[in-house]
Amino acid sequence: MKKPYRKISDYAIVGGLSALVMVSIVGCKSNADDKPKEQSSLSQSVQKGAFVILEEQKDKSYKVVEEYPSSRTHIIVRDLQGNERVLSNEEIQKLIKEEEAKIDNGTSKLVQPNNGGSNEGSGFGLGSAILGSAAGAILGSYIGNKLFNNPNYQQNAQRTYKSPQAYQRSQNSFSKSAPSASSMGGASKGQSGFFGSSRPTSSPAVSSGTRGFNS
């Protein structure tokens, strides 16, 4: 039986509003966690929900700094001054719709070739950062087929994370909540991003390299 306070130490790195929301999520999940549920893939755990923290960068772009499995999807935006706010469903859907239009006309950062990531304006906006995160696999699932086989998306999805460590923590966190995924052939090399693991027969995509990340 999992204790509702078991992972509080994991959230110590997250401050303010995000920490309070995380604690409430863990408490709400405790009853559900008492009932073991078999999961066949990483995508099943992602579909349950994701807690995502996006951090504003100096170039006004956004990066994923932390994300964990959750019973519901919450997206928190932290600005340069450290102020945090939870995006409303209306805001999220508006951002995703705007990003979908960019994907359709080829102007989304997610589907453009990686030009090195260090040029001015090369960062990701809120919409692309959301779709590159675990939350994007849930909230933007209806446009997943536009991204699934796009090689540029497979590379750029990792770049939406602030560091290789943030990406790896996310992959490990969602993998732990889908224990049966390890029995399905191991991690897939060459695919990254949560849309890349959405096939029922796919296993978690975990990259061992650090290429493509921007700090």
Curated annotation (Swiss-Prot):
Residues 1-27 form the signal peptide. Residues 158-169 have a biased composition (Polar residues). PROSITE patterns: PROKAR_LIPOPROTEIN (PS51257). Keywords: Cell membrane, Lipoprotein, Membrane, Palmitate, Signal. It is a lipid-anchor. A lipid is attached at C28 (N-palmitoyl cysteine). The keyword Membrane applies. One of its GO terms (cellular component) is plasma membrane. Residues 170-208 have a biased composition (Low complexity). It is found in: Cell membrane. The keyword Membrane applies. A lipid is attached at C28 (S-diacylglycerol cysteine). InterPro entries: UPF0323. Residues 158-215 are annotated as: Disordered. HAMAP family: UPF0323. This is UPF0323 lipoprotein HP_0232. It comes from Helicobacter pylori (strain ATCC 700392 / 26695).
